[in-house]
Design a protein with these regions (language model features):
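Conserved glycine(s) of the Walker
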Residues: 161-163
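A noncatalytic interaction/capping subdomain that flanks phosphate/NTP-handling catalytic cores
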Residues: 1-159, 169-176, 181-243
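Hydrophobic positions on the alpha1 helix immediately C-terminal to the Walker A/P-loop
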Residues: 166
Length: 243
């Protein structure tokens, strides 16, 4: 029986998060509250109380490294801790996810326990959303996203390429994200903000606008704009997609 539920709209998808293990909202990015919405969900995520996770959260969720593995019934969310441990599941239709967690409103023995639970919980939400996005002709993208005159512009680049620095030069009302955005094809390609900033204090936006262009920031090239060849552009986008 779910004791807590809330609905959001992320990347143009309706997301329902429910929990029978206490309120998970303090473990989500603070900006998530700006994405609250109503409507029938495209994706439902459930967190339930799990005795194995509660026995030793630090050992169960450390280190915060996760992968997805295909199963007959869908996908497994795996934590890598010397050996692979299944932490959650995602349906084959990628419209439902379930993960066991300790009691979320309980007392933590040390602060690190809460921190690792938070990283696993957010990692699972991102994995579920990425799976649903892929099923809906979309993907997350490590990029800064800007809205100008009703159009969206994404700026990808390797670490320290300048995505966050560039984002600081735009008013908050024009910013979709300084690190993680989403692209999805509906009637046309759309650029969406997500609740995850690049760092503490980073800025995000909950809107979505038509995608006009993607720029690859590269400090090794002379200043200016150069059109990329399709193969090179696809390679750069693949590098900047979550893995």
């Amino acid at each position: 029986l779910l004791s807590w539920t809330n609905s959001y709209e992320v990347c143009g998808l309706r997301l329902l998060i429910g929990s029978s293990a206490g309120d998970p909202s303090p473990f989500l990015p603070p900006q998530t509250e700006d994405f609250q919405s109503r409507g029938n969900p495209d994706l439902s995520i459930e967190f339930y109380e799990d005795d194995r996770a509660a026995a030793d959260p630090l050992k169960y969720f450390f280190p915060p490294k996760f992968v997805l593995a295909r199963q007959e019934s869908g996908f497994a969310f795996i934590g890598i801790n010397g050996r692979k441990r299944q932490l959650g599941t995602i349906s084959s239709a990628r419209d439902r996810g379930r993960m066991g967690v300790p009691r979320l409103d309980g007392v933590w023995r040390i602060a690190e326990e809460r921190g690792f639970v938070e990283e696993a919980l957010q990692g699972f939400v991102r994995a579920c959303l990425q799976g649903r996005l892929l099923a809906a002709a979309g993907t997350f993208l490590h990029a800064a996203g800007i809205e100008l005159d009703g159009n969206g512009y994404a700026f990808v680049g390797h670490t320290r390429a300048g995505k966050t620095t560039l984002a600081r030069h735009f008013p908050a009302s024009h910013l979709l994200g300084d690190d993680l955005v989403a692209i999805r094809e509906t009637e046309r390609f759309m650029l969406f903000g997500t609740p995850w900033p690049g760092r503490e204090g980073g800025r995000v936006g909950s809107g979505g606008v038509p995608l006009k262009a993607i720029f690859n920031l590269d400090r090794t090239h002379p200043k200016g704009l150069q059109r990329m060849q399709p193969a090179q552009a696809v390679a750069e986008l693949a590098v900047n997609a979550p893995r």
